[in-house]
Amino acid sequence: MIRSIVRGFGAALPKRVMTNSEIEGVVETSDEWIVQRTGIRQRYIAGEGETTASLGEAAARAALDNAGLTPADIDLIILATSTPDNTFPATAVNIQNRLGMTHGFAFDMQAVCSGFVYAVATADLYIRGGMAKRVLVIGAETFSRILDWKDRTTCVLFGDGAGALVIEAGEGEGTSSDRGILTSQLRSDGSHKDKLYVDGGPSTTGTVGHLRMEGREVFKHAVGMITDVIEQAFEATGTTADDLDWLVPHQANKRIIDGSAKKLNIDPEKVVITVDKHGNTSAASIPLALAVAASDGRIKKGDLVMLEAMGGGFTWGAVLLRW
């Protein structure tokens, strides 16, 4: 059977690092308060000339280099983002052009922090359906540009960046020992749409708007929703937490990550944490974390890896793959 296998990975971050101490000069907060509640110590902030498209392009080129491929080898680009360069055309098309591609097709996917999980699952469907052999899946965000820098409950949380995977068609036996994507579990519940949102848009206010969040409500639902889809991914593949080599969660908040791992009895040593350095980069957080852990040798060929995320909507999901 056809499996969708990870061929390469890459990441890109803005030049500017903003520490918690710098944020102390913007809003009434402290490094101690931020670290204690979120685990975040710094984040990267896009500067002049740095956009979702430029960061996405850089991550894409890094992933292609890692895979030993060129843009000519790619059939499809899927960009997960909530901060596109323009309302339209899709920022994925902009990245396609930046890569010098005039073949194939490209589109954006918007599921906020769950975007990369949704995009990987979608790439898998295109590959297994025979519409693409190689897909460039990118998560890229410039959340700093939709933050209300007077709102200390949100502006301390988010950062900018991009990560990418090259996923290609391969052969498998149809067992959990196969390399590639083994299962995807995706969910959404729009009754929670007002708990994490941006208060503007072209069809309503005609403005970009700012991010608004009911933090306690998000936290209240996060662990349960995340553990539910992870358990369903294990059930679908006949695997367990003991079989897992790495959990690569959406890097939103260390307390949510720790709570999910504890509820699932996953060893903390198996959890990839980058929220301390990157903050919450929304759809970029999982591919950034994958790039860090694969680059430093933690994630190796044959490892069983769980990706999971929850975002505005609410949206949430998990992908279980063998690296």
UniProtKB/Swiss-Prot annotation:
Domain of life: Bacteria
Enzyme class: transferase
UniProt xrefs under PANTHER family: 3-OXOACYL-[ACYL-CARRIER-PROTEIN] SYNTHASE 3, BETA-KETOACYL-[ACYL-CARRIER-PROTEIN] SYNTHASE III
Family stated for the protein in its record: Belongs to the thiolase-like superfamily. FabH family.
CDD domains, A to Z: KAS_III
MF terms in GO: 3-oxoacyl-[acyl-carrier-protein] synthase activity; beta-ketoacyl-acyl-carrier-protein synthase III activity
EC numbers on record: 2.3.1.180
Organism: Agrobacterium fabrum (strain C58 / ATCC 33970) (Agrobacterium tumefaciens (strain C58))
Subunit and interaction comment: Homodimer.
Protein name: Beta-ketoacyl-[acyl-carrier-protein] synthase III
Subcellular location: Cytoplasm
Pfam assignment, any one: ACP_syn_III_C
GO CC field: cytoplasm
InterPro entries linked: ACP_syn_III_C, ACP_syn_III_N, FabH, Thiolase-like
Associated pathway: Lipid metabolism; fatty acid biosynthesis
Keyword Acyltransferase: yes
